[in-house]
């Protein structure tokens, strides 16, 4: 059996780039909660003792940007300079302007267009991917890397590993077998965890705790064997972290946000963007389409692409590829996709209920936008698809 290795990585909620994603989405949530028609393009950057939010926002809401920044940093665990940032003492800079009137007239006609008439907020192409190798219909390498990161945060916050600090990264290499286009995981080849820690803990204690409290609960035993390689804090020291260790910026973890290097990516980030930005809503609808194709048994693995022009409601193109795993020809699956999914931005917003505020988008901004078991992730709902199974 010929196999190959594939690797996916993830980062924790305390990674500087992910901190920025979460602040941008916390701002978006606050805007949508007060005004569901808010138009938001919110970027965040951070470095030692400083967080800046900037971008274009048009909203009827009264938004306390500084409070959102400080609350988000505090909830992650940035409560002192020792851990990389002090939520209550850091400088918060705000530079927000309104959405360009040129964009507004082209996309939503200054709020005069009906939902089916609303154009895409920009040009671009987005991809959705699904695979039958996990219950989440997501790649195993990505699922494990993401769950290791989430588990690191869990054992930090519940006190199991009190030496942990917010920043950290994970990476998992999986050995795969290609079964006529479908991906079959054989074993976990390598596990890498680099986590921020305090001064009091030894490297041996770090390794022991990570194996017992992080790796063991996350990675199924069937994938681990005596040949599995573990790199646990291989640099030897990771005390300085968060924005003190590295600058952070919204939108720099787009592969971690999606499929861990599998499938494809159009390049547009998600966080801080309202649903008229097809970088986000378009990527969500094609994930639902790809997942529904696989979950309905039409294929074992699938990628869907959609593309847009600014101001134009209808997509320019829709593409489906099942990597040779389709039960019927891809052109037939494409017809089914077009019949069952409305790719117009205004209709995607309604069908996926994307204007709701609360902390909905904040939840997406760490540990992945896809494969999550949460009712707020409406794009993860499998649509029933009718199709004729070919006669044997």
UniProtKB/Swiss-Prot annotation:
- The entry marks the following residues as binding Mg(2+), namely 9
Q: Which reaction does it catalyse?
A: L-methionine + ATP + H2O = S-adenosyl-L-methionine + phosphate + diphosphate
Q: What name appears for this protein in its UniProt entry?
A: S-adenosylmethionine synthase 1
**NCBIfam families registered for this protein in UniProt:** metK
Task: Spell out the disulfide connections.
Answer: none
- Swiss-Prot/TrEMBL keywords: ATP-binding, Cobalt, Cytoplasm, Magnesium, Metal-binding, Nucleotide-binding, One-carbon metabolism, Potassium, Transferase
PANTHER family per record: S-ADENOSYLMETHIONINE SYNTHETASE
Return the similarity comment. Belongs to the AdoMet synthase family.
For L-methionine, which residues are the binding ones?
56, 99, 246, 277
Subunit (UniProt): Homotetramer.
This protein's superkingdom? Eukaryota
Q: What molecular functions are annotated in GO for this chain?
A: ATP binding; metal ion binding; methionine adenosyltransferase activity
Which residues are involved in binding ATP? 15, 167-169, 235-238, 246, 252-253, 269, 273, 277
Q: Name one Pfam family in it.
A: S-AdoMet_synt_M
- Pathway terms, separated by semicolons: Amino-acid biosynthesis; S-adenosyl-L-methionine biosynthesis; S-adenosyl-L-methionine from L-methionine: step 1/1
Biological role stated in the UniProt entry: Catalyzes the formation of S-adenosylmethionine from methionine and ATP. The reaction comprises two steps that are both catalyzed by the same enzyme: formation of S-adenosylmethionine (AdoMet) and triphosphate, and subsequent hydrolysis of the triphosphate.
Which EC number applies? 2.5.1.6
Annotated GO biological processes are: one-carbon metabolic process; S-adenosylmethionine biosynthetic process
Entry note: cofactor:
Binds 2 divalent ions per subunit. The metal ions interact primarily with the substrate. Can utilize magnesium, manganese or cobalt (in vitro).
Cofactors named for this entry: Mn(2+); Mg(2+); Co(2+); K(+)
